[in-house]
Amino acid sequence: MQEPAITPDLIAAHGLKPEEYDMILEIIGREPTFTELGIFSAMWNEHCSYKSSKKWLRTLPTSGPQVICGPGENAGVVDIGDGQAVVFKMESHNHPSYIEPYQGAATGVGGILRDVFTMGARPIASMNALSFGEPSHPKTRQLVNGVVEGIGGYGNCFGVPCVGGEVRFHPAYNGNCLVNAFAAGLADSDKIFYSAASGVGMPVVYLGAKTGRDGVGGATMASAEFDDTIEEKRPTVQVGDPFTEKRLMEATLELMQTGAVISIQDMGAAGLTCSAVEMGDKGGLGVRLDLENVPQREENMTAYEMMLSESQERMLMVLKPELEAEARAVFEKWDLDFAIVGETIAEDRFLIMHHGEVKADLVLSKLSSTAPEYDRPWVPTPAAEPLAEVPQIDPIDGLRALLASPNYGGKQWVYEQYDTMVMADSARTPGLGAGIVRVHGTDKALAFTSDVTPRYVRANPEEGGKQAVAEAYRNLTAVGARPLATTDNLNFGNPEKPEIMGQFVGAIKGIGAACAALDMPIVSGNVSLYNETDGTAILPTPTIGAVGLLASTDEIIGKEVREGHVALVVGETTGHLGQSALLAEVFNREDGDAPHVDLEAERRNGDFIRANRALIKACTDLGDGGLALAAFELAEGAGVGLHLDDAPTEILFGEDQARYLVACNFDQAEALMSAAGQTGVTVTSVGRFTGDTVRIGGSEALLADLAATFRASFAAAVA
């Protein structure tokens, strides 16, 4: 096939700036081949190179006594004791999910699961954090239905429980939805597999499904803004097969028991190109590939297509040659391809051959560790104007408005489409707070949560970044878990705009401060930039996924609200309504500053909850919607009415941080308040759980009526 001439239009179509193309010419001293141009495009885009964010990502805390492996590998690895580790990561599949919702979301799940089992861990839990445009937007229903079906279709067939997540709606996502997928797995802490190649002349082996033309250019597409040519990008979306992925996982984990694996990497963004380059670069080696040996499911595939295909369910491995026969037998047993497609070489070289013809011959390190890196100009986000007066409202009317919104109504419509109990180790399913999964064969359990409040981040990126981590800390604490570590999924607009880069920098500063103060290092993550359509950016959305440990399932704080239980707020309430849910849903306002996050108070109050778990029957953190919404959710979940003391609107619906709502019997309440007095923690009685109505001061409604609104609002908006 005649390869196209390299023209300015072709260079631009590959997402390369003119100055970046000049760098390529300087590096290789000649015009690149078409395949080489594609390789540079894939490796130098934002999705693979982090060229706009690397400088700031380096400032995050990534180490701690519990951290076995931090950022840089397929997933983070954290010690949980007894020779075991939890392996986890969160990653975006935003652009593909907007173009083709079902396959975009499904392959997002598949990709994050591969990141986990590539490290030698069997997946035990998944979550997803989803952001969509306003429900009335003509594309929103299609996106919600397609994304949720895609996540369920892939995860359910693969057989991993979905234990939590988030769903939000906002006009800022009308042109770009966000699909952030999280997965966690268990491994022996001394049997973690890494991606750095070692040894010269070692076989490079292709594993899994065959290569097709799906996903060619996907990583480059995921590093660009959308415009009115979006439909043309549909072929760049990958197609997933969860049954093949299941077989690939079983074969990979079985292969790892043979001792044949030197290094292993899944094929995700930029496919064969990125996996081969990363393995070689991390090991200080070069790689030669012979593409005629690549298993192909389509005829007449070019070198360019094979190198950039993002066909799913594929891995690349460097193998001990003496164990080739044993390794091949494992993959043949699982009816998967096993093909030697190249070898490691001593030179810093990426050599691509196809039927004896050189298709690419590049300096390998220039594609990865020494790729371009930018210090983008940025401007701080201006301080928010003071909050204008917020009128007092009838509290039941305010609560009903929140419950009627798909943002704050029940999410059963979503998680009932997911298998939450497969593997039979889920101790708490989605609905309220963190999900919990038992560590099979032990008394331990792991808790998982995903959190961010984008309105806060837009108003005050640094406080919003802190708040995302602090809320994750509280959600883990509220179920009794000790927070261990975090993964971040940083979703922002165009980093070439100084105001967007300022949001990113501010959020990173806040996340870093909170992770350091709360001993929750970042061990993995993902950056998704250029989430803009026709120049309109999403809300800055730095999603935080976090994992906590319970030494025993006896430590789980339940949701056992009973008739007569006292409702107590742990933490200081001042009545912060800026950027609150009430302000948005009742008054159609998004003004004021984000709530301040006092990290010392977060730690002190979290320690207090865990130390006094024996006195607490139910616990939830106070976030969106404040006391009124949190108290209703506890009451609704238990089927018990709620009487809250009369208080001003800002006290009932304010979103002050570092707070929890707990339920306990009268004697326990007295003991808890006594303990608080000795530790400097504020605990306030705010009402009790009783009857079959929700009464707030002098305003009252039937619990059943409010519950019906709560349970129907999401489906009414999107079904």
UniProtKB/Swiss-Prot annotation:
The keyword Magnesium applies. The active site is at 47, 93 (proton acceptor). It is found in: Cytoplasm. Its main location: cytoplasm. InterPro entries: PRibForGlyAmidine_synth_PurL, PurL_linker, PurM-like_C_dom, PurM-like_C_sf, PurM-like_N, PurM-like_N_sf. It catalyses: N(2)-formyl-N(1)-(5-phospho-beta-D-ribosyl)glycinamide + L-glutamine + ATP + H2O = 2-formamido-N(1)-(5-O-phospho-beta-D-ribosyl)acetamidine + L-glutamate + ADP + phosphate + H(+). It comes from the Bacteria. GO terms for cellular component: cytoplasm. ATP binds at residues 50, 89, 488, 525. Pathway: Purine metabolism; IMP biosynthesis via de novo pathway; 5-amino-1-(5-phospho-D-ribosyl)imidazole from N(2)-formyl-N(1)-(5-phospho-D-ribosyl)glycinamide: step 1/2. Substrate binds at residues 92-95, 114, 238, 310-312, 528. Mg(2+) 1 binds at residues 91, 526. Disulfide bonds: none annotated. Mg(2+) 2 binds at residues 115, 266. GO terms for biological process: 'de novo' IMP biosynthetic process. CDD domains: PurL_repeat1 (cd02203), PurL_repeat2 (cd02204). Keywords: ATP-binding, Cytoplasm, Ligase, Magnesium, Metal-binding, Nucleotide-binding, Purine biosynthesis. Its EC number is 6.3.5.3. GO terms for molecular function: ATP binding; magnesium ion binding; phosphoribosylformylglycinamidine synthase activity. Belongs to the FGAMS family. Part of the phosphoribosylformylglycinamidine synthase complex involved in the purines biosynthetic pathway. Catalyzes the ATP-dependent conversion of formylglycinamide ribonucleotide (FGAR) and glutamine to yield formylglycinamidine ribonucleotide (FGAM) and glutamate. The FGAM synthase complex is composed of three subunits. PurQ produces an ammonia molecule by converting glutamine to glutamate. PurL transfers the ammonia molecule to FGAR to form FGAM in an ATP-dependent manner. Monomer. Part of the FGAM synthase complex composed of 1 PurL, 1 PurQ and 2 PurS subunits. This is Phosphoribosylformylglycinamidine synthase subunit PurL. The lineage of its organism: Bacteria, Pseudomonadati, Pseudomonadota, Alphaproteobacteria, Rhodobacterales.
